[in-house]
Amino acid sequence: MRLDLSKDKINLDALFVKQQKIDFDNGDSLLKIAINMPDINFLDIEIYETSINRLINKTHKYQLSNLKIIQVDAHTKDNNFDSFQLFLSGPWYKKKYHKLRLVQTAFLDLLSKTIIHNGKIHIATDWVRYVTTMMNALKNHLHFKNTQNDPIYSLRPGHRPITKFERRSHRPGHDVLDLIFKNEK
């Protein structure tokens, strides 16, 4: 199902009956999660038409009713999601592009409003410098608390599939680190 959105905020209660999760991805890992967790609804936010069409075709192939795809900025009402997932997003490793990194204070402020109390943020990356930046932003944010004490990184949960970017990065010195924080607003 392709959603046609106006300037109004997305009303997920009208789309789904059950709890929702939000994900930014090329769709492959989210598709696997949606297949394995049919009782949970997922919203994929994608900007590339080819990825959208491919994912729509796969949702029809697997007859998934718990996965929706949108091609816009995610304008939703507050307390609308129980979790947010970001797996191996672009690290923008050159210093002049660091401002383009998604996980920064302003973005975390938006997430803290959108995610329910005790909802989770789950991020995975293979770039050590980026994970340090993300960890600092999350640790210093008023509303987010790490679910881990020591070690500070989480093991990859069994429900998180290995993404295509993760498969490419599986080589010595390129460990994928998972960060799972809870929203304590």
UniProtKB/Swiss-Prot annotation:
InterPro entries: SAM-dependent_MTases_sf, tRNA_(Gua-N-7)_MeTrfase_Trmb. S-adenosyl-L-methionine binds at E46, D73. GO terms for cellular component: tRNA methyltransferase complex. Pfam families: Methyltransf_4 (PF02390). Pathway: tRNA modification; N(7)-methylguanine-tRNA biosynthesis. Keywords: Methyltransferase, S-adenosyl-L-methionine, Transferase, tRNA processing. Transmembrane segments: none annotated. It catalyses: guanosine(46) in tRNA + S-adenosyl-L-methionine = N(7)-methylguanosine(46) in tRNA + S-adenosyl-L-homocysteine. The keyword Transmembrane helix does not apply. Substrate binds at K94, D126, T163, K164, F165, E166. Its EC number is 2.1.1.33. GO terms for molecular function: tRNA (guanine(46)-N7)-methyltransferase activity. It is an enzyme of class 2 (transferase). PANTHER family: 3-DEOXY-D-MANNO-OCTULOSONIC-ACID TRANSFERASE/TRNA GUANINE-N 7 - -METHYLTRANSFERASE, PENTACOTRIPEPTIDE-REPEAT REGION OF PRORP DOMAIN-CONTAINING PROTEIN. Catalyzes the formation of N(7)-methylguanine at position 46 (m7G46) in tRNA. Belongs to the class I-like SAM-binding methyltransferase superfamily. TrmB family. This is tRNA (guanine-N(7)-)-methyltransferase.
